[in-house]
A protein has these predicted regions:
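Conserved phosphate-handling catalytic cores of large alpha/beta enzymes
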Residues: 70-141
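Long, highly charged low-complexity segments enriched in Glu/Asp and Lys/Arg with interspersed Ser/Thr
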Residues: 216-240
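Short alpha-helical scaffolding segments that buttress acidic/His motifs in well-ordered protein cores
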Residues: 7, 204-211
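Long, structured protein-protein interaction/assembly regions in large complexes
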Residues: 36-38, 43
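Single conserved hydrophobic/aromatic residue that forms the stacking wall/gate
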Residues: 1-5, 9
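Short hydrophobic alpha-helical runs that function as membrane-insertion/retention elements
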Residues: 41, 60-66
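Short, solvent-exposed amphipathic alpha-helical segments in soluble enzyme
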Residues: 29, 47-61, 79-81, 161-167, ...
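Charge-patterned, long linear interaction tracts outside catalytic cores
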Residues: 117-192
Length: 240
């Protein structure tokens, strides 16, 4: 390839969350203060709407890359630019979303114990002791839970999906999902204060399913249970 052809990525335009078209250099320059050498991207604006709203509220930008061919293109751009990393908008909890406050050692130790307790309660309620659970103190107190999938795991999944088109198995390497629990949320605080409560398991399942639903990855079986559970919660709330 000629140098002009191999450097075509430099002239590639990326559509951002505001509908503006930017070059790679523009994307990196506009966001270097908040996430240097990282470009967040969206593959499905409807499915990832919760994450998009979080990014907009925090003043963080992302680009829209909805096509299957975008994945190998991103890898090509990363190879051409040392240190550059593309991360899907739901790959991790950005530091900007986290509450930043200095605490003493005693408080940190208590937070660690609370996080371990919450993880155990959620795993037991959901019935999955292998579930990855991370507890964070997020600025948005209204958000109780969310699902993240590491970029490495997602790319492996994408590769397996392409492989399955030629007779391979797409479920050989399941995505490494993490349930992120917001310690600042009122419902999560309730779970922590009532870890052995009668209604706590139902609440944990509801928060997990809501996170999966927002992530667009709720299975038909869990969807059926979620609808039934939601109906039961409303009956209890209104005495029906």
């Amino acid at each position: 390839l000629s140098s002009a052809a191999s450097d075509v990525y430099k002239r590639q335009l990326y559509k951002n969350l505001d509908g503006k078209y930017l070059t790679l250099a523009d994307c990196l320059e506009e966001n270097k203060e908040k996430h240097e050498n990282k470009i967040f991207y969206v593959t499905d604006e409807k499915e990832q709407s919760q994450y998009i709203n979080m990014f907009k509220e925090a003043g963080i930008d992302a680009v829209i890359l909805p096509n299957p061919i975008d994945s190998p293109f991103m890898q090509h751009v990363e190879q051409k630019n040392e240190g550059l990393k593309f991360l899907r908008i739901d790959a991790d909890v950005n530091e900007t979303f986290k509450e930043t406050e200095e605490t003493d050692e005693a408080a940190k130790e208590q937070e660690k114990k609370d996080a371990e307790t919450l993880a155990e309660v959620f795993k037991k309620a959901i019935g999955n002791d292998k579930l990855n659970v991370k507890v964070e103190k997020l600025k948005n107190e209204g958000l109780a839970s969310m699902i993240t999938v590491s970029e490495e795991s997602r790319r492996m999944q994408d590769m397996m999906k392409m492989y399955s088109m030629y007779g391979g198995g797409s479920d050989m390497f399941p995505a490494e999902e993490t349930l992120v629990i917001n310690a600042n949320n009122g419902l999560v605080k309730y779970v922590l204060a009532n870890k052995d409560g009668e209604k706590t398991p139902m609440l944990c399942e509801q928060l997990y399913d809501l996170a999966k639903l927002a992530h667009g990855s709720l299975s038909p079986e869990r969807m059926t249970k979620f609808i039934a559970r939601s109906s039961e919660i409303m009956k209890e709330e209104y005495g029906a």
